[in-house]
Every structure is written in structure tokens, then in C-alpha cells.
């Protein structure tokens, strides 16, 4: 697996690539509703709510344009999970740097 891909749980064991997330929005604003309608018409909408109330809309970049994903998880919860993923990644990278510096020092 590519080391640059970090997945975030957006509910019901559904994961998205944290590196491709552009925005996490509430679904109740008019601009988001319009964007969702256009995304549905263009086949760029994923409903991952499992029939539950949509509590957040995740906008992601892809090679072919934007993808909108509906989640039943609150926006603040998703943002916290993204932050946790970033912290874990930073710690992992720091650990690798320390290992490399120890290897260089032992040579």
C-alpha cells in the first residue's frame, strides 16, 4: 500500500482517502444542496449513510473531477478523525526519521 494514503472512517465501516478530502460540510446549506443535485445528475454522488440521516457532505478530488459523499457522521467527528490520522502520520514519520538517524550514527 502507498504510504501517502491515509484512510478516515466516515461511518458504517466506510473509509475515504484523507489526502483527497477538500471540504467537510453540513448538508443543509443551499449551495451544498445545489452542488449535490448536480453531482447526482453527473453520477458523482456517493450515499454512504446506510439509510440514516445525512449529517455531513464530504467533497473529494479525483482525477475526473469532484466527488460528493454523504455520511451519517457529524462534520466535527469527521474532522477530529482527520486530525487524529494526521497526528498518527506525523508520529510515524518522526519515528522513521529517528530510526534513520540512529542507523547513520551507527555506521
Swiss-Prot record:
The keyword Acetylation does not apply. Pfam families: RemA-like. InterPro entries: RemA-like. Keywords: Plasmid. The keyword Signal does not apply. Belongs to the RemA family. This is Putative regulatory protein BCG9842_A0044.
